[in-house]
């Protein structure tokens, strides 16, 4: 199987551009197609994350899940050479992403949008009038936290847009605007919400969550309420403090099996719609990592 991809350039690279791209050798880039020869316009995330648009990270997650991922191998004055990432093959990738997150010898890495700012992830090729926007590759636990905060920030932004007094955006930014990892603090580039439902996919996902809350079968809530009051279970002990007080105030005496069945069907449909995103796009399993060379041995999960 020939995994090599040649990306042809429309103009010769400037010397400083060659140096900047060579610093990224070993990093992952998305490709617009699977062809062995491609043009530079289909390289990176620039086509779904331009300077002129507010970032829709969910759209970028979808793109990363559907595109061809490749490792940058060589940079020359008139072309770039990459190796496609396919299941069953082992790769050596470099931890040269900005901002820097420490990787570990074994575990899982998630390929995700550049959620800490486009400028950190971009190499400008003025010679070819194109920006090469790299994704981030993060340890999966921190990638999960990032996604949680982006989605909840979108929900709060919509709440405040409808009724400014319902939430304090300073408090929202304090809790959702950054992540901490191994003693370091990282600011997220949270998207400003551009008017009613302006970020189609991110808004849709946030609405899925909001609607799903209303679709819980009433029998499920009544069972939880009864168990909390009268019985003990390890799971209940774990989640008891997180069950909202509103559950106790909902009228659950008049149960309808037919209504609950409809709720269950729609809720399961929503869950299936969300499942692909919660896999956090492409994941890499790591077998070894060298802190000296910043190189991980990994394969596509």
Swiss-Prot record:
The keyword Nuclease appears for this protein: no
GO cellular component: host cell nucleus; viral capsid
Keywords: Capsid protein, Host nucleus, Virion
A family per Pfam: Herpes_V23
Chief place of localization: virion
Domain of life from the UniProt record: Viruses
Localisation per UniProt entry: Virion; Host nucleus
Gene Ontology MF: a single term: structural molecule activity
Role, per record: Structural component of the T=16 icosahedral capsid. The capsid is composed of pentamers and hexamers of major capsid protein/MCP, which are linked together by heterotrimers called triplexes. These triplexes are formed by a single molecule of triplex protein 1/TRX1 and two copies of triplex protein 2/TRX2. Additionally, TRX1 is required for efficient transport of TRX2 to the nucleus, which is the site of capsid assembly.
Assembly and interaction partners: Interacts with TRX1 and major capisd protein/MCP.
Family: Belongs to the herpesviridae TRX2 protein family.
Protein name: Triplex capsid protein 2
Species per Swiss-Prot/TrEMBL record: Epstein-Barr virus (strain B95-8)
